[in-house]
């Protein structure tokens, strides 16, 4: 687990439970494929986390305005926004997130609309054909993602 308690009272490197909200605080630099120039342009506008990005660019008009102000392409910004949105789902991670993107699942609400069994099968077949990951996600993992997606608020339109 990436979140460790290193406080004296925590007893050393004890893994902490991660909640779905932790993805909100993911630094922009941890999202896949963020060029340094784009990260620095967003930092000028005080956007350094996924939560800040989703708050500032959750709808098309806001994305267009931020892209113009930060002098980045709307395509780059859209890609970061959808990756920040999916990062809210615990367990998706970079590789499985890219696999979901390839299957056209770009937002949390897209994931919520999926049938877990069908999505699991699609992910398995996709991974067998391109070997994007060492392993395909399990049915239990996919079911957990879809359940989380149902419980998360819609932040991207």
Predicted feature locations:
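C-terminal extensions
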Residues: 1-157
